[in-house]
């Protein structure tokens, strides 16, 4: 599956969080847990994906667009997420 993203949002995330949307493929290639973000109607399906990037649990927000995953967010998991999600991923 192809990965797309807004280049400006990617640069902002690299600068502010030290994470690069271009590395999302490494997360998707491993064991992940994905849930649909149904907190509100965004006008499109949004998926929250938990997975490992270089040994660290990260959270990626994306929307499926045809054969692509369009990344809109990427961040390090917080302590509560690590506690809750890590056992489900068996990490």
Predicted feature residues:
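Ribonuclease/tRNase effector modules and their secretory precursors
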Residues: 1-91
């Amino acid at each position: 599956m192809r990965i797309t993203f807004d280049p400006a949002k990617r640069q902002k995330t690299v600068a502010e969080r030290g994470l690069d949307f271009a590395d999302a493929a490494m997360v998707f290639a491993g064991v992940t847990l994905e849930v649909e973000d149904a907190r509100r109607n965004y006008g499109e399906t949004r998926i929250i994906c938990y997975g490992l990037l270089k040994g660290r649990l990260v959270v990626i927000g994306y929307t499926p667009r045809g054969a692509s995953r369009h990344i809109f967010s990427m961040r390090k998991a917080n302590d509560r997420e690590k506690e809750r999600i890590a056992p489900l991923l068996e990490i």
